[in-house]
Amino acid sequence: RVGERACENGGAMTTVSVVGSTGSIGTQALEVAAAEPHRFDVVALAAHRSVDALAAQARAVHPEVVAIGDADLAAELKEQVPAGTQVLAGADGLAEVATRADVVVNAVDSFAGLPVTLAALQAGRRLALANKQSLIAAGPVVQPYRATPGAELVPVDSEHCAIHQCLAAGGPVARIVITASGGPFRGRSADELRHVTVEQALAHPTWSMGPQNTIDSSTLMNKGLEVIEAHELFGLDYDAVEVVVHPQSIVHSMVEFTDGATLAQLSMPDMRMAIGYAMAWPDRIATPFGRIDWNALSRLDFAPPDTEAFPCLALAYAAGRQGGGAPAWLVA
């Protein structure tokens, strides 16, 4: 049903497949689609093991097809979804779902997202990529498929989404600057970090993310992975990718051009803005997510990262520069 239904304005609706629909990014992608019901038609959903949540989404959205990564749960899922809904299972089922729509949101965790990335690009779909592991661990495998006719890769990570928007201005780039909130332990010394708890690490001050990304954010490992992701996405040398701590998380990233001009993308920290951008690109949609109240915004702070207290950032740079299997080892 790729582009089959018509919008009220006469254009074709954009069909959407959300793989990893029960996780943080997946559920927010469905919120974006619900906010623009005359533009987006969710035709496929997939999850790894969350049968009840996936079935509830299917009953609400009425997709044509659902897929469950754990094949042993397929029969249970089939009993709960609306009649007539096709049920797929296993890794092949997840990959198949990635070919069923105009836009594929890859919100799968870890390496399990790689087949989804490859299937979407091979099918010539627009890939709204939240699964950074696909590029970090398997960049040389993924990159050739970006040249598939019709294939588009639009990043969902707020930082890379910001860079994607700034680069649209054109012109030679001097460097990109990726912002980091600093996480829940910003300002703490290496000695103080020895006594923190998992619960504290999971209490991110700005973003609502899955547990793995939240833990990685507390150590700045996530920011290091984003440096490698930026290298793969935009083809810049690691010396041209910098990180700066920005606790308000309103400036999502910046691009400095060779003439000294710097462009930045600003919005309130709401992942739905970046998700909506990737789903609608190259268009813009009139959703309420991420809008700034400029009368309430009083300051924007920036500082260099503390690489002594947070050595994971330097480790990621080293792995990226080494290349080969080092990035895959880092993200394993």
Language model regions located:
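Extreme N-terminal basic, low-complexity initiation segments
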Residues: R1-E8
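Catalytic, metal-anchored helix/loop core of enzyme active sites in primary metabolism
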Residues: E8-A332
